[in-house]
Amino acid sequence: MLSRRARESNAWFLERFKRPLGRQGSKSNTNIDLATAENWLIRPEILSALKRNLQADFQSSHLSYAPGLGGTPELLSAISTFFNHFFSPTIPVAPEHIVTGAGCSSVLDTLINDICDDGDGLLVAAPYWGSFEVSSVLRNGVTLIPVQIKFHESHSAQGIVDAYRKAMENTSCKVRGLLFCNPHNPWGHILSVEVIDALLLFCEQADIHFVSDEIYALSTFGRMELPSGNLEHGEKFLSPATSFVSVLSRDLIKLGGCLITQANKELRMSQAILNNAKLCNAASAMVAPILGSTSQLSTLVNLNVQRMRKAARTAIQFAQFHGLTFCEPVAGVYIWLRLSEDCHTRDDEEEIVQRCTKHGALVGSGSDYSESQPGWFRLTFAIPDNEFLEGLNRIETAMGYKERFNGEMVQSSLGGFVSQLWKRFVLV
């Protein structure tokens, strides 16, 4: 017999995710998955590097428990090198600032446990990744407070901060932090330095935590104001009361995640305790040499960016070809778009999902991300070219589009694509 806690948690999960759960169970292995946010474009090179490291560096000691609290010394040192090289933080990241875990979600679970009590709340811009609710509501009894922001209408830092402040004032629960996803999932955009600094100041004034989820920090390929990563900002805001926390699940290597807190030793220790013995020692041995070799990783990152840019261009061209409303991605592995302007209800949205599934293309619906307006969908483009084009063709069939996109469009002399550009949201 399950505990009361388990029964209540399971009931909540089955109700909250009943639509996506209802789409599972297909016996077909010919479906093309455009719903799951994974990067397949750099996998051959990553797999080769991991195999090489396993063969060259794996020792009998790696079959034992990992030494150290928060991660092995080798892995913590490699992660420190990684952050300092790629993000150039004002305050260098030291091994003692880092805690490793089994993945970004796992680390986020324990982090929310440490900064929130039952019934507390976290501010988060909507739409947002659905599993944020798993880490907050399911695991910790913490409420997510959606902050409705129309980024295509408001580009001012003050306007965005005002939206967070309004959401905080209108909620009945105690707000303990701001959950910041940058690059954003599912929009695929990056907020400006001005906005980030304004949000950090807001958190300091409100005496709440700033939690920065940056899992796509290295997958940036388009126009943006912020170089990559947020660690170079916020030095003047760092304090134990308003700790700047970075959660990064390495977007090239899904073999774990880590948390960084540079000013809160108490939080770092608590996180190290909660995540102790969670990360496989063998995984650490395979990943550490890659993260610690800046030259090797730079090559992989550059190659990944080239492939991501090409794939994103195809996704954008598809949306332009059919005159769809979309958010132009500059980071991440997906595009956020409307497959139909005649989608007005959640049932309409789910009907489109089912149609696409029937034709062998799995897509993510806006309701999965707490999008307030029905009709938005997330399509992952970081898969092999032929699979992505086939997936798009299946969507065309499902939607009844009269014309077929073949992956090519004529470019103007200015480099812009000939399309209905007025329907594009450039979110930078």
From Swiss-Prot:
Q: What does the UniProt entry report for the null mutant?
A: Completely abolishes the 11'-deoxyverticillin A production.
Supply one GO molecular-function term. Answer: pyridoxal phosphate binding
Quote the Pfam families the UniProt record gives: Aminotran_1_2
Its pathway is:
Mycotoxin biosynthesis
Q: Which SUPFAM superfamilies match?
A: PLP-dependent transferases
Query: Do you know what upregulates this one?
Result: Expression is regulated by the cluster-specific regulator verZ.
Question: What are the names of the required cofactors?
Answer: pyridoxal 5'-phosphate
What keywords are assigned to this protein? Aminotransferase, Pyridoxal phosphate, Transferase
Annotated EC? 2.6.1.-
Q: Which Gene3D superfamilies match?
A: Aspartate Aminotransferase, domain 1 (3.90.1150.10), Type I PLP-dependent aspartate aminotransferase-like (Major domain) (3.40.640.10)
Q: Which GO terms describe its biological process?
A: amino acid metabolic process; biosynthetic process
The entry assigns this protein to a family as follows: Belongs to the class-I pyridoxal-phosphate-dependent aminotransferase family.
Report the protein name in the record: Aminotransferase verI
Query: From what organism does this protein derive?
Result: Clonostachys rogersoniana
The organism's lineage is: Eukaryota, Fungi, Dikarya, Ascomycota, Pezizomycotina
